[in-house]
Swiss-Prot record:
It is found in: Apical cell membrane; Basolateral cell membrane; Cell projection, Microvillus membrane; Cell projection, Cilium membrane. It holds the Pfam family Prominin. This is Prominin-2. Binds cholesterol. It comes from Homo sapiens. The chain crosses the membrane at residues 107-127, 154-174, 427-447, 473-493, 780-800. Residues 1-26 form the signal peptide. The gene is PROM2. The lineage of its organism: Eukaryota, Metazoa, Chordata, Craniata, Vertebrata. Residues 27-106, 175-426, 494-779 are extracellular. The modification Phosphoserine is found at residues 727, 818.
Length: 834
């Protein structure tokens, strides 16, 4: 039973392994290949990208916002498309009234500036003449009760006005310097922005060539992994079939052991039976002689004692088992002659070694196909090879370069003039801001000296020169204000007119898209300024659409009008290349015929066991004889009984003969019966072993032979199915490397090499340079300077008024004065009454 159970377990494992192998062979599991490598490609795009320009947030942002809101109030009219069209195409057709109507807000500001320019210097001239004739200014004539309140109010108003002037002039200084600092770099950034677009089209073929050359990275990776594909295939076959092969080989080995043991027991059984039969032939006459003599002796009348009991024992002295009655096994031994012919242990070990060597065997068998695959991988797909040659950018590149060169050459003189005039503006701005600052200082010094003089006026020992000096400082500030009022208002209006129109006409319309709409409308731009033609845009794409598409990362060939249509996906189509690799992979084959599983000698042994009829032997017949004693009567007990009877006899001759018989029985038992009993025990062991294994042995042998035959027949199909699955996994893995390359090329070309995004970036940077870097500080400067200019008027008024109170007051008697001025009261003499 133990052998049977030990054999059934591998057979059950074999059945389960066969089912699992079929499932594993039908399913594609690519985990055994491990994770794919991540390829690292070298960027091929040149560094022509400009960093996006953004004005850093600062304290002046709120000032810039205030100026923009002020300009939006000044200019309420929409973008003057017709007026700009006339200015660009036919300057003589421009009507003045249309310009005035559009610039109505600026005209109002010009009127205000004109009035300021006329009235303030005129007032200053009149004030100067009046002062020369001592008609204006001067000092307070008389002291009255409200004098202190008036003086304090004027001083407070003058101080507040001066502080407002100080704030304005500080902001004017800061914005003037900021404008000057940003004007130079901004002007230099314009050519830099144009140069960044120079190679936008012309550099594309060289960069595409560099991209195509990096196809070698996936090629090298695939070629490297092809070196191990044979081992991978063999390992996969080994892994998926070992659940079937190992149990089957274990079952074959176990069955071989059972076969060897069974044949040994059968041979032992046959030899033992022969010996037992021969022993019985020798034992039977001897027992019969002893029985006859004992019957004769025990039946004599001279026999004394329990002769009757001994006589009954002697009558049963005969053979118990008759081994001539057991069935013959000669025909079975004849069938198993020479079995086992094979060494099952070494055969199973050899088959296991052959099965475990499948990876190396597969590598050897696939080496020639792998070399052909490497040759196929080394070839470059036609689309990738012509990636750069197919880009039709020569004519577009020359047209693009010519347009950029014309723009750069035409703009360079203007930029130089702008930079030169900016220097003049900065110098004039610094001078005028310094004048305003000097006015502020005069006001502050005048106020300080005046207050000091007022505090010392009650002390007769202190002269009133301090108050007089304070008044003179205030009048000096007034004189400077009148003197520089005209240059200030002229600078303010000139910078206001330029900067305001740049902001409202260009920057504002640029931000809301009206400038793009104007450029896209046919006929608005002269032929020499046709941007669509200069940029080489497609006919069905407007400038605004091109800008939006470029901002979203569109490719050049979707925006520019190239010679031929360029289809990147067509060049990246490597299906023909991969199909060839797939065909080459399908030619991979692994021969598993070297795995016999069962040698011919072992098969003959199992077939002989199967047809031997070992299970048809009637083993109960053997057990019947084995269970019987060799001699029915216990010869030792009978001999002991005879020994006692011999001693009880009076007749010495009878007693002597009984002793001789007792000793004879003992000798016969030791010489014949005991060996027979040993042979019976040996026979019992073999019969029991064969009885337990023989009934199922034929079925087990049939199952093993059937499983070996089935697995041997299905092994090539299973191996081919596993090979196909492994090939598909390997192909998918290798195609993943080419997919990485295609994805990288698509991203590199569309987002970095052949993208028109630098064009939108250049436009955005140009807007930031013009509007945020130049126009905002420029407009903030004139706004702050205008602040100072208009606050000079209240400064003049309050300074003139306040200076009067800082000069000494002329004291004189008055008839209407109070009694404090009447030092003496002399009573008049009246008439006396007696």
């Amino acid at each position: 039973m133990k052998h049977t159970l030990a054999l059934l377990a591998p057979l059950l494992g074999l059945g389960l392994g066969l089912a699992l192998s079929q499932l594993a062979a039908g399913a594609t599991d690519c985990k055994f290949l491990g994770p794919a490598e991540h390829l690292t490609f070298t960027p091929a795009a040149r560094a022509r990208w400009l960093a996006p320009r953004v004005r850093a947030p600062g304290l002046l942002d709120s000032l810039y916002g205030t100026v923009r809101r002020f300009l939006s109030v000044v200019q309420l009219n929409p973008f003057p498309s017709e007026l700009v069209k006339a200015l660009l195409n036919e300057l003589a057709s421009v009507k003045v009234n249309e310009v005035v109507r559009y610039e109505a807000g600026y005209v109002v500001c010009a009127v205000i500036a004109g009035l300021y320019l006329l009235l303030v210097p005129t007032a200053g001239l009149c004030f100067c003449c009046c002062r020369c004739h001592r008609r204006c200014g001067g000092r307070v004539k008389t002291e009255h009760k409200a004098l202190a309140c008036e003086r304090a109010a004027l001083m407070v108003f003058l101080l507040l006005t001066t502080l407002l002037l100080l704030i304005g002039v500080v902001c004017a200084f800061v914005t003037n310097q900021r404008t000057h600092e940003q004007m130079g770099p901004s002007i230099e950034a314009m050519p830099e922005t144009l140069l960044s677009l120079w190679g936008l089209v012309s550099d594309v073929p060289q960069e595409l060539q560099a991209v195509a050359q990096q196809f070698s990275l996936p090629q090298e990776q695939v070629s490297e992994e092809l070196d191990g594909v044979g081992v991978s295939i063999g390992s996969a076959i080994h892994t998926q079939l070992r659940s079937s092969v190992y149990p089957l080989l274990a079952a074959v080995g176990s069955l071989g052991q059972v076969l060897q043991v069974s044949v040994h027991h059968l041979q032992t059984l046959n030899a033992t039976v022969v010996e037992l039969q021969a022993g019985q032939q020798d034992l039977e006459p001897a027992i019969r002689e002893h029985r006859d003599r004992l019957l004769e002796l025990l039946q004599e009348a001279r026999c004394q004692g329990d002769c009757a009991g001994a006589l009954s024992w002697a009558r049963t002295l005969e053979l118990g088992a008759d081994f001539s009655q057991v069935p013959s096994v000669d025909h079975v031994l004849h069938q198993l002659k020479g079995v086992p012919e094979a060494n099952f242990s070494s055969m199973v070990q050899e088959e296991n070694s052959t099965f475990n060597a499948l990876p190396a065997l597969a590598a050897m068998q696939t080496s020639s196909v792998v070399q052909e695959l490497k040759k196929a991988v080394a070839q470059q797909p036609e689309g990738v090879r012509t990636l750069a040659e197919g880009f039709p950018g020569l004519e577009a590149a020359s047209r693009w370069a010519q347009a950029l060169q014309e723009v750069e050459e035409s703009s360079r003189p203007y930029l130089q003039e702008v930079q030169r005039y900016e220097t003049y503006r900065w110098i004039v701005g610094c001078v005028l801001c310094s004048v305003v600052l000097f006015v502020v200082l005069c006001n502050l010094l005048g106020l300080n000296l005046g207050i000091w003089g007022l505090s010392a006026r009650d002390d007769p020992s202190h002269p009133e020169a301090k108050g007089e000096a304070g008044a003179r400082f205030l009048m000096a500030g007034v004189g400077l204000s009148f003197l520089f009022a005209a240059p200030l208002i002229l600078l303010v209006f000139a910078t206001f007119l330029v900067g305001g129109n740049v902001q409202t006409l260009v920057c504002q319309s640029w931000e809301n898209g009206e400038l793009f709409e104007f450029a896209d409308t046919p006929g608005n731009l002269p032929p020499s300024m046709n941007l669509s033609q200069l940029l080489g845009l497609r006919k069905n794409i407007s400038i605004h659409q091109a800008y939006q598409q470029c901002k979203e990362g569109a490719a050049l060939w979707t925006v520019l009008q190239l010679n031929d249509s360029y289809d990147l996906e067509e060049h990246l189509d490597i299906n023909q290349y991969t199909n060839k690799l797939r065909q080459e992979l399908q030619s991979l084959k692994v021969d598993t015929q070297s795995l016999d599983l069962l040698s011919s000698a072992a098969r003959r042994d199992l077939e002989a066991l199967q047809s031997s009829g070992l299970q048809r032997i009637h083993y109960p017949d053997f057990l019947v004889q084995i269970q019987r004693p060799v001699v029915k009567t216990s010869m030792e007990q009978l001999a002991q009984e005879l020994q006692g009877l011999a001693q009880a006899q009076d007749n010495s001759v009878l007693g002597q003969r009984l002793q001789e018989e007792a000793q004879g029985l003992r000798n016969l038992h030791q010489e014949k019966v005991v060996p027979q009993q040993s042979l019976v025990a040996k026979l019992n062991l073999s019969v029991r072993a064969l009885e337990s294994s023989a009934p199922n042995l034929q079925l087990e042998t049939s199952d093993v032979l059937a499983n070996v035959t089935y697995l041997k027949g299905e092994l090539p199909a299973w191996a081919a199915r596993i090979l196909r699955n492994v090939s598909e996994c390997f192909l998918a893995r290798e195609m993943g490397y080419f997919s990485q390359y295609v994805a990288w090329v698509r991203e590199e070309v569309t987002q970095r090499i052949a993208t028109c995004q630098p064009l939108s970036g250049a436009l955005d940077n140009s807007r930031v340079i013009l509007c945020d870097m130049m126009a905002d500080p420029w407009n903030a400067f004139w706004f702050c300077l205008a602040w100072c200019t208009f606050f000079l008027i209240p400064s003049i008024i309050f300074a003139v008024k306040t200076s009067k109170y800082f000069r000494p007051i002329r004291k004189r008697l008055s008839s209407t004065s109070s009694e404090e001025t009447q030092l003496f009261h002399i009573p008049r003499v009246t008439s006396l009454k007696l």
